[in-house]
Design a protein with these regions (language model features):
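Mixed-charge, low-complexity interaction segments
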Residues: 1-162
Length: 163
């Protein structure tokens, strides 16, 4: 699920739909997630193309932070501080559980690490990340989990330098 969400985000960054590291759970992102899912996973008897699970659970990765709907005003009032993530930043599953409506009500957006987002601005880095995500997590491995996703994301600045 996380690889599919990242591929959808990469596509929307490339098409200039996503222009900043604040990733909202928009209809366009949901649609793109489903398109990517169908392309690589097809119809699965085990999994369904549910964007809410990776959108929520990616907060356990060091590059993804959920921002609560009520946190936005406090963040705007506070002084600008560097992007950082603490365990205290982890959010609880919203009332209504895993539904797009519940996620939208609970979270204003997910914030991607600025460094990672900057890397995604590079066409070659996007292409390389796509290949890695597809080959490692989506090709003939429908049930493989992503234990090394954080390491992969932290290596992206090096990939961008090579590209």
């Amino acid at each position: 699920h996380k690889a599919v969400l990242l591929l959808a985000i990469i596509d929307l960054v490339e098409s200039n739909v996503i222009r900043c590291p604040q990733i909202e759970l928009t209809d366009e992102l949901v649609k793109r997630f489903r398109e990517v899912w169908r392309r690589y996973l097809g119809q699965s008897a085990i999994f369904t193309p549910d964007i809410t699970k990776p959108f929520f659970h990616m907060q356990h990765e060091p590059f993804w932070r959920l921002v609560g709907a009520h946190d936005v005003e406090a963040m705007m009032a506070a002084e600008q501080r560097p992007w950082r993530k603490d365990k205290a930043d982890r959010k609880e599953l919203p009332k209504g559980s895993y539904s797009v409506a519940a996620m939208r009500a609970a979270f204003a957006y997910a914030e991607m690490d600025n460094g990672l987002f900057a890397v995604l601005q590079n066409e070659d880095a996007r292409a390389m990340l796509r290949v890695v995500l597809i080959n490692e997590y989506l090709t003939n491995q429908p049930t493989k989990t992503m234990p090394n996703l954080a390491q992969l994301m932290m290596a992206l600045p090096m990939i961008a330098l090579v590209a």
